[in-house]
């Protein structure tokens, strides 16, 4: 299923998953925000979005049994395949667990028709003994989302034109200065660029990559401001 297959509010976007190494099509800002959280979670091993509830005959049967109208194509009134926003694979000890999650703004949960469609979803996943739940904006910490958006960067190491040795030296120097100095992140990165003879911006890109790969750990509940000190809680260097 693609973005073109579903009506959207104009906030749809495609995001490359760090966990999955593939592009995901998210249909709203709320879905995107939740995706960032899932993609960061260490125990999440796969994420599928707009997961189809098949066979269609099963959701039709559920709707008939509870006496509600199954979702239809507004043009021809034919029943359509329902979807759950996220189908997630989660590592649990030596095994895996599957979870289904529907993302909805909290102000839609009082709508009668929305509740009816959610009940079809709930019963569909209940039959499969798969955990199903609703995620609203109240469950998504926005400060963490903002930070995750900022640190997500696909570094083009070829464009930076750095050897593995230069990258390692930069990581060591940045880690040392970030933990020992009280200067802003941009100031420390600029100093590292000058000291190691790197192109302007190289060190900042490396820091963002180190945050993404967890070589540097920070409290993501606290806002990251490049012009302020970046408080490191743990480093691999």
Language-model-derived ranges and their functions:
Residues 1-237:
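Electrostatic, structured charged patches in enzyme active sites and in nucleic-acid/phosphate-binding
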